[in-house]
Amino acid sequence: MLFYSFVWSVLAASVALAKTHKLNYTASWVTANPDGLHEKRMIGFNGEWPLPDIHVEKGDRVELYLTNGFQDNTATSLHFHGLFQNTSLGNQLQMDGPSMVTQCPIVPGQTYLYNFTVPEQVGTFWYHAHMGAQYGDGMRGAFIIHDPEEPFEYDHERVITLSDHYHENYKTVTKEFLSRYNPTGAEPIPQNILFNNTMNVTLDFTPGETYLFRFLNVGLFVSQYIILEDHEMSIVEVDGVYVKPNFTDSIYLSAGQRMSVLIKAKDKMPTRNYAMMQIMDETMLDVVPPELQLNQTIQMRYGHSLPEARALNIEDCDLDRATNDFYLEPLIERDLLAHYDHQIVMDVRMVNLGDGVKYAFFNNITYVTPKVPTLTTLLTSGKLASDPRIYGDNINAQLLKHNDIIEVVLNNYDSGRHPFHLHGHNFQIVQKSPGFHVDEAYDESEQDEMTVPYNESAPLQPFPERPMVRDTVVLEPSGHVVLRFRADNPGVWYFHCHVDWHLQQGLASVFIEAPVLLQEREKLNENYLDICKAADIPVVGNAAGHSNDWFDLKGLPRQPEPLPKGFTTEGYLALIISTIIGVWGLYSIAQYGIGEVIPNDEKVYHTLREILAENEIEVSRG
């Protein structure tokens, strides 16, 4: 009896100390110039950009009111990346944020309340729009959960966001990307990289003091390196998980990943300042335009009068030294989940469909948004919630039993890197292959031969006794990764590539975990129902919006039909470029009859010919 009295007194004290953070934000377009080179519309809160970082403590409550203040037809939603929204601790899945997965989009004029507690997590997280590629236009910020009992000491704390930056609006870039005129699926090349939403940054250091740097890659696409000149970092936290200190001078962060490091300043005043390098992962870019700056130098300044650090070149840096997260170990020892109850094998592919667009696939299925949020379908379907048919055949629904150990195997039949993020859980990384054939040039038709899929009977490396735990992991080119987690958080959890261009291509799945138990814990609240009605989205029904017959999927959005047999990406490219050349020819004839020949005509022609030659396609000038 005394024990229970003690427990309840501790809980009561925790509740008494917890704070409630009431935040009111209106999202709208604001004009900004993050890189100093190009003014554009960014997404601000309350008329300001960058968005504020949110700092809370473990056990605090957040009440964030998000109002859609866009004056156009832009809808939005907000996700708190890495937060479990654990329903067993009183939170609601309706607070997770991905549009048409766990909520309806917030249309202009509507307000949605994100109301949750953060009782069991600490560390570095972030919040961002989860609709289209919106957060690339700045709708993002750090979300830091401070721990009164941090297992390390430091004198100063700095939150550092890394991101790629596009000069064009995300809607324009997405439209050009998902187009038959981009049949190779080449990802949009950013125009710059940002360090804390800007460039040309100087960081002040005091001799003898220790700094906690919380690095977050909040970009849409490109992974980034951070490299220190003549300084060392001690990695102490990854994706909200404390790790045993690991010393390095270089780290690697994909989109969505976070890493906290301790940096010890020089003991005595040095004779010069030093460099911190921020470098794009060039291997993720199909082409590198000559005007693209792949890196920038951040000054680590000890004194205003000291000589500045020289700008380092990428050639000066050994990128292979970046820490491999597979070999990190959680500070709180967690043994390997030694077996699995349910295995999900997902083959990642990029394929053109009949509309000429290149889509991303898990097991030959590309994610297509349903007419009703998946959470709505689950919570209004009664006993049918455990039947995968009601969720449609284009969201890659995976039904998981409560407390089962789940193994997810990802095989990469693509030549690019993919950072995968799971909502609602961390996972153990039990196998992670290197990339294969990264520097080789080979035809797309040879990809299956180049890929090294996971062989359960002959894993490439021993299973770690205490695997690294995080929520976002990089799948290497032509390689594989194996993840395990316990399905102990009932919900509708999005699993997707955090290269947002790949998410727009459909590289996503939905893990529907313990649906009957979730029905017992959660009901759709009035605010949820109101924003759905405002968006003209049904508040009951299957993926197609039908509730009279739950297995009637008539009208469900589906992926386009496949290309005709034998019609390749190269063939499509030849058709498009030949058409362009033909149109160019007709245009030139018309121009010749009415005025001077356009000076750049010959340049356009030769550029198109070069593209054809690179793809080994022959087209006569005609």
UniProtKB/Swiss-Prot annotation:
Binding positions (Cu cation 3): H130, H423, H496
Primary location group: membrane
Role played: Iron transport multicopper oxidase, which is required for Fe(2+) high affinity uptake. May be required to oxidize Fe(2+) and release it from the transporter. Essential component of copper-dependent iron transport.
Protein name listed in UniProt: Iron transport multicopper oxidase FET5
Additional note from the record: Present with 2840 molecules/cell in log phase SD medium.
Organism: Saccharomyces cerevisiae (strain ATCC 204508 / S288c) (Baker's yeast)
Protein family membership: Belongs to the multicopper oxidase family.
UniProt: Cu cation 2 binding residues: H81, H128, H498
Quaternary structure (record): Interacts with FTH1.
